[in-house]
Amino acid sequence: MPRPASESWSPIQSRIPAYKAVSHLRLLPTANSPSGSNQPTNPNRAQHPEGPQSREGATSPVLASLEPPTPTDLPSARARPRVPAESGPGWLHKARRPTRGILRDVLRHRGVPAQPRPAPGAHQLSSPSS
């Protein structure tokens, strides 16, 4: 039996079974269902005791009075400024880098010349301050 031209119909709708099209919806309350049930028709919609309001009005006054802390109030921001090389995508949270040993010349500033290292055992022979 052909469908009337006034009814909107597409070939995609004809391939979807009717039980799959409405399987995610809950049945609406009918005349024989008890009227005292507070079950919402949409399971994803929460029912609030104060009724539908805007989200600004739903905030408690205690939470509304608190302001989010500024980044300078946080102790990690006051510790030291971030170096641009440390803020890249490959930088991980590492422990404090060592400043003793062979890495001292690597970590020094570019403008400061490197101090020559004494030979092994030279501190036993003479002091460098004389």
From Swiss-Prot:
It comes from the Eukaryota. Residues 30-45 have a biased composition (Polar residues). Residues 23-130 are annotated as: Disordered. This is Putative uncharacterized protein ST20-AS1.
